[in-house]
């Protein structure tokens, strides 16, 4: 019988730490439900003790997920473990994940303890977690730079204390494949009680080795891989879920293992994470990059036409990638739009059909032809002006010539009925529009990030603008999508300002409660 490798997804914990602006609870839940459909065995969804917001998002996800084990991170500290339990206890199935640093560098410089103390703390943490659940994972942080004797010692102690999964992370992406594989082999051979736990690996990609290290670890006895969608994560990122899963699937002859992942969901989840996290996917990224299945050289194209196996080791359909249909126009009905979304594997619960269809009609009128990737962008950027928004972009025009500075006219609708207008100059049309909007709202805002991405191809491609603005020490994220860059920039700022207004509203409600 083929051995199964457990896929532990940490997109919403280790992946989210790398983002410029935090995801909302709604966005996190959307990703968690997509991960559940993907078939991940375990999803790590936050660090509950770190903030009330993180605690609440872990609790919300724990309440909704039925077909995967939900876990949260905690240091080897009582209050962390207790907070993790309180957030997770509503889940159908949960795990507590606790960790402590084990390398000499961390033990001496960060913890300022002896290694004996660290082993004692690990044992106490695992025992406390076992009071709450039979499923406890222990990680020795920075194992890649820890001596093998110390790794074996702390792992044995953690298993004796009740750990059911022991994780050997290469926290700083320092190891090379043979070296890391050897660490796993030694843990497997030298720890006397290792048969009572699953060996897990968690690799970072600082030297580009995360996928290779994870696969080598599996060949040496690891049976859980910790990874993220698109490999997102701190610094150079984490092991990429899609890469390790497809490597084990395509090379099952060599690896001799499989996973529970429904690979046809990979493309969809990858796109969702990219858009919600504002993390573009490099075109030549393995498995999910836009060029991953493109064959532009004449020789390759000729071979592909004769027999696609000449240059293709897996079919695009395996990861849920379908050829784009070109038949969506302004004349297409709601059923056609819904049908295209269903073809891409989305359920009606994943998006608001009414809002999507309205946005689709506006885009189809401008563009003529609408592609599947356009629909995905419209469906999952939940920001084009909704009912609850205080501010709506009503009219916009911007002019710029070589001789004269740029000027912009902006009309906004405030609170559903009040029209406010401003005409002002700026250093280019986008700057002029931003000056006009800020002039109307009177908010003090500092732009800390502006990114423009083309969605689609050709002159009529959609321009997606992602911004992060700072207001009173807090960061707010805005996204705008339109065929015109100035319009998408304006929509992004209006989106961010609406988020600020919502934050003000929440603050007012809280203040009210305290008085």
UniProtKB/Swiss-Prot annotation:
Any stretches that span the bilayer, and where are they?
A: none
Report the pathway entry.
Amino-acid biosynthesis; L-leucine biosynthesis; L-leucine from 3-methyl-2-oxobutanoate: step 1/4
Keywords assigned: Amino-acid biosynthesis, Branched-chain amino acid biosynthesis, Cytoplasm, Leucine biosynthesis, Manganese, Metal-binding, Transferase
- What sequence ranges are listed for the domain Pyruvate carboxyltransferase? 5-267
SMART domains in the record: LeuA_dimer
Query: Which reaction equations make up its catalytic activity?
Result: 3-methyl-2-oxobutanoate + acetyl-CoA + H2O = (2S)-2-isopropylmalate + CoA + H(+)
The record's PROSITE patterns line, in alphabetical order, gives: AIPM_HOMOCIT_SYNTH_1 (PS00815), AIPM_HOMOCIT_SYNTH_2 (PS00816), PYR_CT (PS50991)
The terms describing its cellular component in GO are:
cytosol
Per the UniProt entry, the signal peptide is none
- Write down the required cofactor(s): Mn(2+)
Pfam families, alphabetically? Answer: HCS_D2, HMGL-like, LeuA_dimer
**What is this enzyme's EC?**
2.3.3.13
Region Regulatory domain, as annotated, extends over 392-515
Set out the biological process GO terms recorded for this chain's protein: L-leucine biosynthetic process
Keyword presence, Cytoplasm: yes
- Positions that bind Mn(2+): 14, 202, 204, 238
Give the family this protein belongs to, as stated in its UniProt record: Belongs to the alpha-IPM synthase/homocitrate synthase family. LeuA type 1 subfamily.
Subunit notes for this chain? Homodimer.
Cross-referenced NCBIfam families: leuA_bact, PRK00915.1-1, PRK00915.1-3
- Would you tell me the protein name for this molecule? 2-isopropylmalate synthase
Provide the species name: Haemophilus influenzae (strain PittEE)
């Amino acid at each position: 019988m083929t051995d199964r490798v457990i896929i532990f997804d940490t997109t919403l914990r280790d992946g989210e730490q790398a983002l410029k602006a935090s995801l909302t609870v709604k966005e996190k839940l959307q990703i968690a439900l997509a991960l559940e459909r993907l078939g991940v065995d375990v999803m790590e969804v936050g660090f509950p003790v770190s903030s009330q917001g993180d605690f609440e998002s872990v609790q919300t996800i724990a309440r909704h997920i039925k077909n995967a084990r939900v876990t949260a991170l905690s240091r080897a500290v009582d209050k962390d473990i207790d907070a993790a339990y309180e957030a997770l206890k509503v889940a159908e199935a949960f795990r507590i994940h606790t960790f402590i640093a084990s390398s000499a560098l961390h033990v001496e410089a960060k913890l300022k303890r002896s290694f004996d103390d660290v082993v004692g703390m690990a044992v106490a943490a695992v025992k406390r977690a076992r009071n709450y659940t039979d499923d406890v994972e222990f990680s020795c942080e920075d194992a890649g730079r820890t001596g093998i004797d110390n790794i074996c010692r702390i792992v044995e102690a953690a298993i004796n204390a009740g750990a059911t999964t022991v994780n050997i992370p290469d926290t700083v992406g320092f190891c090379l494949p043979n070296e890391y594989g050897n660490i796993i082999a030694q843990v497997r051979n030298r720890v006397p009680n290792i048969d009572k736990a699953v060996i897990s690996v968690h690799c970072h990609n600082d030297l580009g080795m995360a996928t290779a290290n994870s696969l080598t670890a599996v060949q040496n006895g690891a049976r859980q891989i910790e990874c993220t969608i698109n490999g997102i994560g701190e610094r150079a990122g984490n092991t990429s879920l899609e890469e390790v899963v497809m490597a084990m699937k395509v090379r099952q002859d060599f690896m001799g293992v499989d996973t529970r992942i429904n690979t046809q969901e990979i493309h969809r989840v990858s796109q969702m994470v990219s858009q919600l996290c504002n993390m573009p996917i490099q075109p030549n990224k393995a498995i999910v990059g836009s060029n991953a299945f493109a064959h532009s050289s004449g020789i390759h194209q000729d071979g592909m036409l004769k027999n696609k196996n000449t240059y293709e080791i897996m079919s695009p359909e395996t990861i849920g990638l379908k050829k784009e249909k070109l038949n969506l126009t302004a004349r297409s009905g709601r059923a056609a739009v819904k049908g295209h979304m269903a073809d891409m594997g989305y359920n009606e619960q994943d998006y608001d059909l009414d809002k999507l269809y309205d946005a689709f009609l506006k885009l189809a009128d401008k563009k003529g032809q609408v592609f599947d990737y356009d629909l995905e962008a419209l469906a999952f950027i939940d920001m084009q002006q909704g009912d609850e928004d205080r501010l709506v972009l009503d009219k916009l025009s911007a002019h710029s010539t070589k001789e004269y500075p740029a000027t912009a006219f902006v009309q906004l609708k405030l609170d559903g009925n009040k029209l406010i207008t401003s005409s002002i100059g700026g250093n280019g049309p986008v700057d002029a529009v931003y000056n006009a909007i800020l002039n109307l709202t009177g908010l003090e805002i500092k732009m800390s990030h502006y990114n423009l991405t083309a969605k689609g191809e050709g002159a009529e491609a959609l321009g997606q603008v992602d911004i992060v603005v700072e207001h009173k020490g807090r960061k707010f994220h805005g996204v705008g999508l339109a065929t015109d860059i100035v319009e998408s920039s304006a929509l992004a700022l209006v989106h961010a300002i609406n988020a600020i207004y919502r934050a003000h509203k929440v603050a007012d409600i809280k203040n009210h409660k305290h008085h």
